[in-house]
């Protein structure tokens, strides 16, 4: 009889897709022993729904259960148990941490899944130590950020906004303690991509300081870590009819000559910043494909209203601008794309690494500033953009210089990041191949469930 594994992603494409990709991998490689069920928060947006529909058709062994807001998780799990048997494991997104109370009540082995960098997990696990040291006056907040195990020295500006607020920080520290009590933490990364953070997680140095300053309890134990990535979408469920024409346009461009600019589902700029980006691209002289979303001041503006007068006409021979959305995986995997200006969302980073595309790092929100530090200083697969103020405004001249530098594959930093990302691509393929580090971790995980 197959063992049932239940996956519970948080809302949002950036959380649903990597969780579903984990389910796909488990179902594909362990179909004889595992039955995978995914609880979906309802309702997903149209883009995510297309993706889920495509996965469901291609991998019918996965069962998708759509949760309505009124459904209680306890009743859903009790129904699953009555229909078959108790799940072998329950894997939840860290944003759904309250679900652990339910799974522990039912005595179901519980794992947290991070669709984030190992560096972010290391920071998360270290938050109780930061809280303890700063609260007791052992060290300042700034000093503590410079010595987080597995991470390069950080500044407060590199931290996610909630970790700069005392009350929110305490909530994250408490969440970290709860995670340490779990059966394990699964991370969408691989050993060679983030080796220092990987070792810090595996060796438990992210929690060891807390353990030294407290008696040994479940709150201070080292959780088991499983790095299983890169688990990324293959583009299934993205538009096949090329409504915008961007894929047809890419077909006409020379190999590795186009820089792609896209900033995620929530990446919006002011109208003035959009115009600054346009000027930088025009002056760079590079071919480009740019996804423009409405500015946060107004919506439903045409490209002509958003962009500098005459920009589209002046750049039509070497550039294309599309409104709101492009099939990112298909774009990054296209032969003509040679660079990526990204908001540093972890899914986007893994997609670029998987397809060998070097990046310019332009973080906007959440943990993306932390990702930038790691991408630039540790992974060395991206160039940083300099911002002129605390709101993150970037001048046209800065974007112009970085895009030119990135697309110059013959010399300087552009050549170096291209070399590094191509090496990371090979490492990514190896990690998920038979005998690779991530494949071994996944097999070990399944072995634990089926004992």
UniProtKB/Swiss-Prot annotation:
The active site is at 15 (proton acceptor), 93 (charge relay). Pfam families: UDPGT. An anthocyanidin binds at residues 15, 366. The keyword Glycosyltransferase applies. It catalyses: a 7-hydroxyisoflavone + UDP-alpha-D-glucose = a 7-hydroxyisoflavone 7-O-beta-D-glucoside + UDP + H(+). UDP-alpha-D-glucose binds at residues 326, 328, 343, 346-348, 351, 367-368. Its EC number is 2.4.1.170. Keywords: Glycosyltransferase, Transferase. Expressed in roots. Detected in stems and leaves. Induction: Down-regulated by methyl jasmonate. GO terms for molecular function: isoflavone 7-O-glucosyltransferase activity. Isoflavone 7-O-glucosyltransferase converting daidzein to daidzin, genistein to genistin and formononetin to ononin. Shows some activity toward the flavanones liquiritigenin and naringenin, but not toward cyanidin, isoliquiritigenin, apigenin, luteolin, kaempferol, quercetin, daidzin and puerarin. Belongs to the UDP-glycosyltransferase family. This is UDP-glycosyltransferase 13. It comes from Pueraria montana var. lobata. The gene is UGT13.
């Amino acid at each position: 009889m197959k063992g049932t594994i239940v996956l519970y992603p948080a809302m949002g494409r950036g959380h649903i897709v990597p969780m579903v990709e984990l389910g796909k991998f488990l179902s594909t490689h362990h179909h004889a022993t595992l039955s995978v069920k995914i609880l979906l928060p309802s309702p997903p947006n149209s883009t995510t729904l297309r993706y889920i529909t495509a996965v469901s058709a291609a991998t019918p062994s996965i069962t998708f259960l759509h949760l309505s807001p009124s459904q209680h998780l306890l009743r859903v799990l009790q129904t699953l148990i009555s229909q078959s048997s108790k799940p072998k494991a329950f894997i939840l997104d860290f944003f759904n941490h309250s679900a652990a109370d339910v799974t522990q009540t039912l005595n179901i082995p519980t794992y947290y899944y991070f669709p984030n960098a190992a560096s972010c997990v290391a920071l998360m696990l270290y938050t109780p130590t930061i809280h303890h040291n700063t609260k007791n006056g052992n060290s300042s907040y700034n000093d503590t950020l410079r010595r987080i195990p597995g991470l390069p020295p950080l500044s407060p500006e590199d931290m996610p906004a909630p970790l700069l607020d005392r009350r929110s920080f305490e909530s994250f520290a408490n969440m970290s303690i709860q995670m340490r009590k779990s059966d394990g933490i699964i991370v969408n990364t691989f050993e060679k991509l983030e080796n220092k953070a990987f070792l810090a997680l595996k060796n438990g140095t992210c929690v060891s300081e807390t353990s030294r300053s407290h008696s040994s309890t479940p709150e201070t134990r080292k959780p088991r870590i499983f790095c299983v990535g890169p688990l990324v979408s293959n583009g299934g469920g993205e538009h096949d009819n090329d409504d915008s024409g961007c894929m047809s346009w890419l077909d006409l461009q020379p190999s590795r000559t186009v820089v792609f600019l896209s900033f995620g589902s929530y990446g919006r700029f002011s109208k003035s910043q959009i115009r600054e980006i346009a000027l930088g691209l025009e002056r760079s002289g590079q071919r480009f494909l740019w996804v423009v979303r409405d500015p946060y001041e107004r919506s439903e503006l045409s490209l002509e209203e958003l962009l500098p007068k005459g920009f589209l006409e002046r750049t039509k021979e070497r550039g294309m601008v599309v409104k709101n959305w492009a099939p990112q995986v298909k774009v990054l995997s296209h032969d003509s794309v040679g660079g990526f200006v990204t908001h540093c969302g972890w899914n986007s980073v893994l997609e670029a690494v998987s397809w060998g595309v070097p990046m310019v790092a332009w973080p906007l929100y959440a943990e993306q500033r932390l990702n930038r530090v790691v991408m630039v200083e540790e992974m060395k697969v991206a160039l940083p953009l300099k911002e002129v103020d605390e709101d993150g405004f970037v001048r046209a001249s800065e974007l112009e210089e970085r895009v030119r530098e990135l697309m110059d594959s013959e010399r300087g930093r552009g050549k170096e990041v291209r070399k590094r990302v191509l090496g990371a691509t090979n490492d990514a393929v190896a990690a998920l191949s038979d005998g690779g580090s991530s494949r071994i971790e996944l097999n070990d995980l399944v072995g634990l469930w089926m004992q």
